[in-house]
A protein has these predicted regions:
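Conserved redox-cofactor binding core of oxidoreductases
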Residues: 1-54
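Hydrophobic alpha-helical scaffolding
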Residues: 10, 23-30, 88-89, 112, ...
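Glycine- and acidic
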Residues: 18-24, 82, 253-263
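Glycine-rich loop(s) and the adjacent beta-strand/alpha-helix scaffold that form part
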Residues: 26, 43, 52, 56-60, ...
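Short amphipathic alpha-helical segments and helix-helix/interface helices
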Residues: 37-38, 119, 273
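A broad structural signal for short, well-ordered beta-strand segments within beta-sheet-rich domains
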Residues: 53-54, 65, 236
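Short, hydrophobic/aromatic-rich segments at coil-to-beta transitions
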Residues: 63-69, 223
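FAD cofactor-binding and catalytic pocket of flavoenzymes
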Residues: 115-266, 270
Length: 273
């Protein structure tokens, strides 16, 4: 989510630079660090503890949460913080891991898990993608096209499920243009310079050095692609659970994952193509 207009002196409006993964310098996007944590610290009423790997939520004899036990990642020692209220916001799987690791007499199956569903109904987005190149765009003049992408071109779901053999839906995202190169840009060049001439020259696939740099510049901005991102059906049998034998480097039991796509997700992905 982005801000389309300035709301205060702390956050500005999105300028559509398209580099959200590099963090937003005007705080126009939503992220917990800039929108929640930073303003909270500025109040002077919040202590932020970094390098803390939460182990479990501590409870009293009545089974009520009393604080958190964590391992300091720098000295590998365990510490405890007492609290009147404990809120977990550790993402889907890590929150489930904390709850399942927080066993006690009152909570033998893990905290807040009397229903037995913590960790179950785990699902992700479905997806299928395709890409290609437009030869007419080879070697073109450089422009700043950082904003081109999902922010500008998007196809929402509009089909009638009654006429399809799967539930839910998906949207389609598009990408391409001369966006700012990131890590890995230009890799796989053997699939390009072995098929198309570069500035009128036929080359072998691959290459290195000055010739490879020429090829990367020549093909830059000619790639286009589209990808479908859909909604899966939550099912009880798809789950994460605590591994009884494996712990991480801090001695905290890790998660096992048991998930697979149903025929609905497979049919949805085929429909995307």
């Amino acid at each position: 989510s982005i801000l389309t207009k300035k709301i205060n002196d702390e956050r500005g409006a999105c300028v559509y630079c398209g580099q959200c993964n590099r963090s937003c310098k005007v705080y126009g996007d939503f992220s917990s660090s800039s929108v929640l944590v930073r303003p909270a610290i500025l109040t002077g009423n919040v202590d932020l503890i970094t390098g803390a790997m939460a182990r479990e939520v501590m409870t009293d004899n009545e089974g009520k949460a009393t604080g958190v036990s964590y391992v300091n990642k720098f000295d590998n020692q365990e510490y405890q913080i007492n609290a009147k209220v404990v809120i977990l916001g550790a993402s889907t799987c890590e929150t489930a891991r904390l709850l399942l690791n927080s066993k006690s007499t009152k909570h033998p199956n893990g905290l807040a898990n009397s229903s037995g569903v913590v960790g179950h109904y785990l699902h992700d987005s479905t997806g299928a993608a395709m890409g290609g190149v437009i030869p007419a765009l080879f070697g073109r003049k450089r422009y700043n096209e950082d904003g081109v992408g999902g922010m500008h071109v998007y196809t929402p779901w509009w089909l009638d499920n009654k006429k399809l053999d799967f539930p839910r839906g998906y949207h389609i995202e598009y990408w391409g243009g001369m966006s700012q190169p990131g890590y890995g840009f230009g890799m796989g060049m053997q699939g390009m310079n072995g098929k198309f001439q570069v500035n009128g020259k036929t080359k072998e696939a691959g290459g290195y050095g000055e010739s490879l740099k020429e090829d990367v510049r020549f093909f830059y901005g000619a790639n286009v692609g589209m990808g479908g991102r859909g909604e899966a059906v939550p099912r009880f049998e798809n789950k994460c659970s605590i591994d009884p034998d494996v712990v991480d480097k801090y001695g905290i039991p890790v998660l096992n994952f048991d998930c697979k796509n149903s025929e609905y997700e497979i049919k949805q992905a085929k429909h995307m193509k």
